[in-house]
C-alpha cells in the first residue's frame, strides 16, 4: 500500500498514483504459500507448484486489471511492470508468458538478488529500483 495526500504543487510531486486495483482468489491454493510466525520471525514455505499456478492465472488477472484501468493496448512491453519477485522461476515464467523484453522485470530481479523474497515488503524495494532506473534515463 502506498498512502499519501495531495502534493504541495510548488515543492512536491507524486512518484506513483494508483488508478486501479484488482485481486483474484484461486480455489484450492490455500497451502501454496504457507507462512509461520515463530519466536525467531516469520518463515514461508512456497509450493513447487507456485510458478505454474501463477503462469496459468496471470494473463487473466492482467486482462482484468487492464480492463478496469480502461486501457486497450495489450502491448505488454509498453507497460510499466512492478512485480513482486517471489522467485526466479516466477519472474522467468512471467517474462515468457507475456514475451517481455528482459529489462521489463529488471527492478524485480535486482530486488530479488539484493534482498531475496522478503515477503510482501519486497515490492517496496522493486518500486525503489524503478525510481532509480527512471532517474538514470
Tell what function each PLM region has:
Residues 51-55, 59, 63-66, 75-137:
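Claisen-condensing/thiolase-fold acyl-transfer catalytic domains that form or cleave C-C bonds
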Residues 1-67:
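Condensing-enzyme catalytic core mediating Claisen C-C bond formation in acyl metabolism
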Residues 71-72:
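Charged, gly/pro-rich, cysteine-poor intrinsically disordered low-complexity regions
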Amino acid at each position: 500500500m502506498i498512502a499519501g495526500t495531495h502534493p504541495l504543487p510548488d515543492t512536491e510531486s507524486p512518484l506513483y498514483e494508483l488508478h486501479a486495483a484488482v485481486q483474484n482468489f484461486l480455489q484450492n491454493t490455500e497451502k501454496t504459500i504457507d507462512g509461520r510466525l515463530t519466536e525467531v520471525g516469520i518463515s514461508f514455505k512456497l509450493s513447487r507448484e507456485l510458478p505454474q499456478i501463477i503462469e496459468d492465472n496471470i494473463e487473466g488477472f492482467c486482462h482484468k486489471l487492464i480492463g478496469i484501468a480502461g486501457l486497450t493496448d495489450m502491448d505488454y512491453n509498453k507497460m510499466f511492470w512492478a512485480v513482486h519477485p517471489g522467485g526466479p522461476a516466477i519472474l522467468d515464467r512471467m517474462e515468457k508468458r507475456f514475451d517481455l523484453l528482459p529489462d521489463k522485470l529488471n527492478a524485480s530481479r535486482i530486488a530479488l538478488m539484493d534482498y531475496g523474497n522478503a515477503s510482501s515488503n519486497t515490492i517496496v524495494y522493486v518500486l525503489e529500483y524503478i525510481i532509480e532506473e527512471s532517474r538514470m534515463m
